[in-house]
Regions:
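Mobile active-site "lid"/loop adjacent to the S-adenosyl-L-methionine
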Residues: 117-119, 132-181, 188-192
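Conserved SAM-binding motif I beta-strand of class I
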Residues: 95-100
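SAM/dcSAM-binding transferase cores
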Residues: 28-43, 51, 62-64, 214-274
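Conserved class I S-adenosyl-L-methionine
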Residues: 70-79
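Glycine-rich helix-loop-beta junction characteristic of Rossmann-like nucleotide cofactor-binding loops
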Residues: 62-68, 172
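Conserved S-adenosyl-L-methionine
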Residues: 202-212
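S-adenosyl-L-methionine
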Residues: 104-134
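Conserved SAM-binding loop of SAM-dependent methyltransferases across substrates and taxa
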Residues: 80-91
């Protein structure tokens, strides 16, 4: 599937460069204006959180209480650190560990540490277990996202790819009675991914926090208790993918890129989490 996805991305890049959508050159500036007037963006600035996504995690935890009693929390794709801040405030003692390809500026929280690296790298995974003193995580959470292309079909597949990657990693690093929180889009692969989650976990919930933008296709899947007889999707852990995804992070923005919450197609616009 990845070879197909990689080809699709390359074709889309060429189409966008040769035929940019009408008005697309203004999309980033429009998004920035809307973002800066948005309630949770301004609230994060006032309250000292690094991103508006902090409030999504707060709202999810208010509902599910996954931080209650947690001592080891792993945040995948943790930059810029908004989820690390919330987790660090929410657990007593223990350790919150964030992993990202980019270096995360110091949060000055005693129970929060970070690792620069790719969590799919076995050496990084061993480093995580070492930091957790040989124990697995009580909570694994992933708000991972790549710069969007502005092309729904491509962005949907890329986001599901990240979610499946997080699921594979969670299988190795989460305690059997632990929690997983992961972001997905309500797109073509959404239902298939939910089936995969249910094959992995005994309890699976689909939630859209109030802090998510109204026009966003994103939802969060919250799951608890790994099944003893679980099955996981195809492992997406090849060395080639490590390199190609790292390279994608360094690409020059395309017209319409960096719009993480554009409106979804109409068939998904009225769809509610189930």
């Amino acid at each position: 599937m990845y070879q197909f996805l990689n080809l699709l991305v390359k074709v889309t890049i060429r189409l966008l460069k040769d035929n940019p959508a009408k008005g697309s050159e203004n999309m980033p500036s429009r998004w920035l204006h809307e973002r800066k007037t948005e309630h949770y963006y301004n609230k994060a600035k006032v309250e000292g959180y690094r991103s508006r996504a902090s409030y999504k995690l707060k709202q999810l935890n208010d509902e599910f209480k996954f931080f209650d009693g947690a001592k080891r929390v792993l945040d995948l794709g943790a930059a810029p650190g908004g989820w690390l801040q919330v987790a660090g405030e929410s657990i007593e003692g223990g350790l919150v560990l964030g992993v990202d390809l980019k270096e995360i500026d110091d949060l000055y929280m005693e129970n929060v540490e970070t690792i620069v690296g790719d969590v799919r790298d076995p050496a990084v995974q061993e480093g995580i277990l070492t930091r957790f003193q040989g124990e697995k995580a009580d909570v694994v959470m992933s708000d991972m996202a790549q710069n969007v292309m502005g092309v729904w079909e491509v962005d949907d597949l890329r986001q599901i790819h990240l979610a499946r990657m997080a699921l594979s990693i969670t299988d190795r690093l989460l305690k059997e009675d632990g929690w997983m929180i992961v972001k997905v889009f309500q797109g073509k692969e959404h239902e298939a991914f939910i089936r995969e989650m249910r094959a992995m976990f005994e309890q699976v919930f689909i939630v859209k926090p109030l802090a998510s933008r109204k026009g966003s296709a994103e939802v969060y899947v919250v799951a608890k208790n790994l099944r003893k007889d679980r099955t996981i999707p195809e492992d997406l852990n090849s060395e080639g993918e490590l390199q190609s995804f790292a390279e994608e992070q360094e690409k020059e923005p395309l017209p319409g890129e960096n719009l993480p919450d554009y409106g979804e197609p109409e068939e998904y616009g009225k769809k509610k989490p189930s």
